[in-house]
From Swiss-Prot:
Source organism (scientific name): Buchnera aphidicola subsp. Schizaphis graminum (strain Sg)
Pfam name, any one: ATP-synt_ab_N
Topological type in the membrane: Peripheral membrane protein
Protein name: ATP synthase subunit beta
Job of this protein: Produces ATP from ADP in the presence of a proton gradient across the membrane. The catalytic sites are hosted primarily by the beta subunits.
Catalytic activity: ATP + H2O + 4 H(+)(in) = ADP + phosphate + 5 H(+)(out)
GO cellular component: plasma membrane; proton-transporting ATP synthase complex
GO molecular function: ATP binding; ATP hydrolysis activity; proton-transporting ATP synthase activity, rotational mechanism
């Protein structure tokens, strides 16, 4: 029998509903407001006793009033999964928001629905891989390589290029990699979502991407759950035996939505005002993003860093779950070097001679040691000038500046801004070029020739024109 209740209190996105004491809904159950004018789903967060449950609205509570009838659907929020979602934009509840009509399977078979709250795969079901996933972005492939089935975080403050880097990764991997991708926009700008849709359409990869959006203007409950909707779609593809790419932009907004919900529910805040359940909420999401014996989920997550402070509880909690961290630096962006990835602050578990091989490992560490030494010499250069350096250090500084410029790269998705055609650089060419710079093969070339190019052949060609 369907349990019905009525709304007794509305405070913003929090709605209290009273049920009969013998039919109180379970935690996380979906409730539906029965009204012709209002289509609203609520999710149970707390049982307050005396048959009253406290819920969070998944949409706007405008027009709600006390006394409205609410139905317990008897299950968690369910969303459509499978190939019907490819090339479409859906919201947290699985409803289409791209004005292209309802979702349907190509063979007109019945849509499959999965609940968004699911258990993470057991230890026995999980599988790990050490296969490297080539991205075509020089600095990433060299310094912080991605693994197939791994988790990657793009860390950066406001406006240093997290979304552009993510769009380039999707474009490169989705074109080179034949599998499916799921893009989940959590609390980001609607304009970015629109740009992204058109970018995928122009790159002709839209039919391989499922888009799930919960933008900045949505209520906190919606932004808190939209990541689970995207993840559930990715899990379905993985369980069909596919290798899936899951992109989440932005994990910080997921944390922030949790903070808002926590405050609305009256919980005592912890450090810096975050929710006391921050680590648990992050774990609930991250533990499900994993590879099994059936298929893999490789995830790339943008992480906004408040005030460029990597020790803030939100990015700090995310660090623990990642295999590779790509750190974007405002100082590098200020030099006009894009992508503004900091090679000294970015790390990867895959950068191990047993996984990537000795040549790759030695080249990456050689690049880092030269850049580190250049960093140390910067103060001396600023105070005393280049003339006070030893001959050895002068050569090192020259190579470091070439490396720094050669780590820049024109992106396909940023062609309209940079005016340079995008470049995809293979790992083999990448290692060969940096090995040559470290070894002094290109000491005679001017450093300007290394800026905004792809391969070392382009540098040589550009140097002849200078």
């Amino acid at each position: 029998m369907i349990a019905t209740g009525k709304i007794i209190q509305i405070i913003g996105a929090v709605v209290d509903v009273e049920f009969d004491q013998n039919s109180v809904p379970k935690i996380y159950n979906a409730l539906e407001v029965k009204n012709k004018k209002i289509q609203l789903i609520l999710e149970v967060q707390q049982q307050l006793g005396a048959g009253i449950v406290r819920t969070i609205a998944m949409g706007s509570t405008n027009g709600l009033k006390r006394g409205l009838i609410v139905i317990d659907l008897g299950h968690y929020i369910k969303v459509p999964v499978g190939q019907a979602t490819l090339g479409r934009i859906i919201n947290v509840l699985g409803k289409t928001i791209d004005n292209k009509g309802p979702l349907k399977n190509l063979d007109n078979s019945k849509l499959e629905y999965w609940e968004i709250h699911r258990s993470a795969p057991s230890y026995q079901e999980q599988a790990s891989s050490q296969e490297i996933l080539e991205t075509g972005i020089k600095v990433i492939d060299l310094i912080c390589p991605f693994s197939k089935g791994g988790k990657v975080g793009l860390f950066g403050g406001a406006g240093v290029g997290k979304t552009v880097n993510m769009m380039e990764l999707i474009r490169n991997i989705a074109i080179e990699h034949s599998g499916y991708s799921v893009f989940t926009g959590v609390g980001e700008r609607t304009r970015e979502g629109n740009d992204f849709y058109h970018e995928m359409k122009d790159s002709k990869v839209l039919d391989k991407v499922s888009l799930v959006y919960g933008q900045m203007n949505e209520p906190p409950g919606n932004r808190l759950r939209v990541a689970f909707t995207g993840l559930t779609i990715a899990e379905k593809f993985r369980d069909e035996g596919r290798d899936v790419l899951l992109f989440i932009d932005n994990i910080y907004r997921y944390t922030l939505a949790g903070t808002e919900v926590s405050a609305l529910l009256g919980r005592m805040p912890s450090a810096v005002g975050y929710q006391p359940t921050l680590a648990e909420e992050m774990g609930l999401l991250q533990e499900r993003i994993t590879s099994t014996k059936e298929g893999s989920i490789t995830s790339v997550q943008a992480v906004y860093v408040p005030a460029d402070d990597l020790t803030d509880p939100s990015p700090a909690t995310t660090f623990a779950h990642l295999d590779s961290t790509v750190t974007l630096s405002r100082q590098i962006a200020a030099l006009g070097i894009y992508p503004a990835i900091d090679p000294l602050n970015s790390t990867s578990r895959q950068l191990d001679p047993y996984i990537v091989g000795d040549e790759h490992y030695d080249t990456a560490r050689g690049v880092q040691s030269i850049l580190q030494r250049y960093q140390e010499l910067k103060d001396i250069i600023a105070i005393l000038g280049m003339d006070e350096l030893s001959q050895e250090d002068k050569i090192l500084v020259s190579r470091a500046r070439k490396i720094q410029r050669f780590l820049s790269q024109p992106f396909f998705v940023a062609e309209v801004f940079t005016g340079f055609p995008g470049k995809y650089v293979s790992l083999k060419d990448n290692i060969r070029a940096f090995k040559g710079i470290i070894g002094g093969e290109f000491d005679n070339l001017p450093e300007q020739a290394f800026y905004m190019v792809g391969t070392i052949e382009e540098v040589i060609k550009k140097a002849k024109l200078l």
